[in-house]
């Protein structure tokens, strides 16, 4: 109570401090760099990551793009290349014309090289940058190149992808927050008992969201996914805590004549309840931090921090605001639109065997769909973008006109004998889907003496430490075909140079697939175990964690199984994140009902009356909480043109509804079925089991 009384006493200073903290938070939020490159989150010790660093360090080359130039004369292409070379951070521009010095007749260059760079109406230009794929300066360079090239040119590559992604995110993100706020407000206006309190909630939660976004500055940078989802998720998840305080305060007002004393008791009650409840949510987010694909750590830390700040705001800023606006809040109260649920709850409990059958019947198809969905995810980030984006159009041109879907790069020892390199190139060219392997050795020896090659070309393909070879592939990034191709190329490479490295977007994506497959198992296990232990401690029971997690896991299986049955493919990160977010965020519904059920049983009610009362009293809170999460995420899912954001928000929205329905219909049935087991395995309830037994013996 000391803390609660202090909050009430210092309510005005608390509001002033919160408002003052918004200023540095705003600056911190604006200064936090946003990372749009998924490949940056791969473990740093992987060959693909090490190879990218070597390429940048030894050749001064980081990002790489192909430009498709249509209907342009060779002399104009040459002029265009000269203009592109002047762009800041463009390291090298490689085209058909640049492969030979002007004094060397083009006729003596291999036909394969000509075909690689030219079709009937198009020319291919390769651009190397001296900065990393997702560096701000690289994205600026991409924009400059596009402005120079005009409508006849199409810029592809990962840097073009992250540039388009950044531009689209910056355009959409403010609208995400606006949609979430408007729809969450509508949900609260409908389901709460005051026309004014939703706006007080939003003020308190909004301050905590800004503090969370501002403190991200100390992380250095966050991913665009984290930035897009953080505000929406924090609003949806921490809304529950505000609702709990408001309900508690209204109850205490009827017990105490002084509203300040009522608030002090409400804060104490809320703190006890909300800390236990928030632990499951925090555990779900912290589980993401155990991913070796460090995007999970990024999202996990930011969201766990947001939940903690949400709890702090709920017991400090929110009570201060409620007391400040108490009179208008009380005047704006109205009767709740949610009817009395006693009769409905009695009906659900009466037919509980039906819901046991439903539970058993749903497990197999839900689990099958869930496993299939996990197998059908996509990893190509280009699929996240709308079809009219410049990157997507450029990739289509590259595929249609040059039959080119992905580009790999090889780094081999500079001292590797030319004959071995030629032999390796020959073997690699024989691999299915490889169009051509370009290196010094594929030019030299085809009628072109090495000394005839311009220095600009030899510098691109060889340094003191490494030889660089470029492999063009017909196979799409992240496809099974390209992954098998990469395995074959790596086998050939290691035969000639055990320290050689195969790098590029497709090899990185293959590493990402293998990394996230492992992460999925780890994160799921950690989140389930952590939440199991928290429920076991909170409920002082061994059996209840199994029952509660079974209910929410079924909801997760249904939610993530539906995309398979609907013929939808999800971005790879969605199932990993959603399974933990849904478990952590919605298991609170089950804990709320179970806690009331225990209290009723300990008060002497039989199992039917206990479950009915628990269900009837919990439904309003579960509906408000579930609809709040649904409202905050559904609008964003419908609006967003970025599939990874849209998919994750749709899964969260649907997950809230599915979890809500499972808790309302299936959890009561399981509590009825397992009542004896619960009593025997829950601290302080064993005597109820004996009591039931003695009653049955008397009968």
Model regions and ranges:
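Structured non-transmembrane domains adjacent to transmembrane bundles in polytopic membrane proteins
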Residues: 44-65, 69-162, 371-378, 382-544, ...
């Amino acid at each position: 109570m000391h803390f609660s009384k202090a909050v009430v006493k210092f309510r005005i200073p608390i509001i002033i401090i919160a408002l003052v903290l918004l200023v540095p938070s705003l600056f911190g939020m604006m200064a936090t760099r946003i990372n749009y490159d998924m490949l940056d989150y791969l473990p740093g010790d992987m060959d693909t990551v090490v190879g990218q660093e070597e390429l940048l360090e030894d050749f001064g080359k980081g990002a790489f793009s192909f430009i498709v130039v249509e209907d342009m004369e060779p002399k104009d292409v040459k002029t265009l290349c000269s203009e592109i070379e002047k762009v800041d951070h463009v390291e090298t521009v490689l085209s058909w014309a640049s492969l030979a010095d002007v004094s060397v007749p083009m006729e003596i260059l291999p036909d394969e090289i000509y075909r690689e760079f030219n079709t009937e109406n198009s020319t291919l230009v390769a651009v190397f940058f001296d900065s990393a794929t997702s560096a701000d300066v690289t994205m600026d360079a991409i924009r400059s190149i596009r402005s120079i090239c005009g409508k006849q040119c199409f810029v592809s590559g990962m840097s073009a992808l992250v540039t388009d992604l950044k531009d689209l995110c910056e355009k959409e993100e403010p609208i995400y927050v606006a949609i979430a706020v408007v729809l969450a407000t509508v949900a609260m206006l409908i389901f709460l008992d005051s026309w004014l309190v939703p706006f007080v909630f939003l003020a308190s939660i909004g301050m905590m969201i800004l503090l969370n976004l501002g403190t991200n500055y100390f992380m250095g940078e966050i991913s665009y996914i984290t930035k897009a989802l953080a505000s929406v998720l924090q609003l949806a998840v921490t809304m529950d805590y505000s609702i709990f305080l408001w309900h508690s305060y209204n109850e205490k007002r009827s017990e105490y004549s002084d509203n300040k004393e009522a608030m002090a008791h409400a804060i104490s009650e809320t703190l006890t309840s909300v800390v236990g409840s928030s632990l499951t949510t925090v555990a779900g987010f912290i589980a993401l931090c155990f991913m070796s694909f460090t995007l999970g750590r990024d999202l996990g830390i930011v969201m766990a921090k947001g939940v903690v700040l949400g709890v702090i705001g709920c017991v400090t800023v929110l009570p201060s605001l409620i007391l400040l606006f108490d009179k208008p809040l009380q005047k704006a109260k109205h009767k709740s639109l949610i009817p009395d649920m006693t009769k409905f709850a009695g009906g659900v409990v009466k037919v509980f065997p039906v819901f046991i059958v439903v539970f058993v019947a749903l497990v197999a198809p839900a689990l099958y769909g869930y496993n299939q969905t996990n197998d059908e995810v996509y990893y190509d980030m280009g699929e996240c973008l709308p079809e009219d984006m410049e990157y997507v159009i450029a990739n289509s041109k590259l595929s249609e006109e040059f039959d080119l879907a992905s580009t790999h790069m090889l780094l081999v020892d500079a001292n590797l004998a030319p004959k071995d390199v030629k032999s390796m190139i020959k073997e690699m060219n024989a691999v299915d889907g490889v169009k051509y392997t370009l290196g010094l050795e594929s030019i030299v020896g085809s009628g072109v003496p090495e000394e005839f090659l311009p220095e600009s070309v030899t510098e691109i393909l060889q340094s003191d430490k490494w030889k660089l070879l470029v492999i063009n592939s017909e196979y799409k990034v992240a496809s099974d075909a390209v992954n098998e191709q990469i395995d074959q190329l790596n086998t050939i490479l290691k035969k000639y140079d055990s320290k050689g490295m195969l790098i590029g977007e497709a090899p990185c994506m293959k590493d990402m697939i293998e990394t996230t497959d492992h992460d999925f198992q780890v994160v799921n296990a950690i989140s389930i175990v952590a939440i199991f232990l928290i429920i076991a401690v909170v409920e002082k029971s061994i059996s209840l964690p199994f029952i509660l997690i079974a209910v929410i896991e079924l909801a997760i299986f249904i939610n993530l199984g539906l995309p398979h049955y609907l013929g939808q493919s999800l971005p790879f990160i969605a199932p990993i994140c959603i399974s933990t977010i849904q478990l952590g965020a919605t298991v609170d519904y089950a804990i709320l009902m179970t806690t009331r059920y225990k209290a009723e049983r300990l008060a002497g009610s039989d199992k039917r009356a206990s479950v009915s009362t628990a269900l009837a009293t919990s439904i309003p809170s579960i509906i408000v909480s579930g609809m709040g999460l649904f409202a905050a995420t559904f609008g964003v899912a419908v609006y967003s043109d970025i599939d990874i954001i849209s998919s994750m928000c749709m899964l969260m929205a649907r997950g809230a509804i599915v979890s809500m329905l499972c808790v309302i219909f299936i959890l009561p049935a399981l509590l009825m079925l397992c009542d004896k087991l619960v009593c025997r395995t829950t601290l302080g309830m064993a005597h109820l089991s004996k009591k039931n037994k003695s009653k049955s013996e008397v009968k």
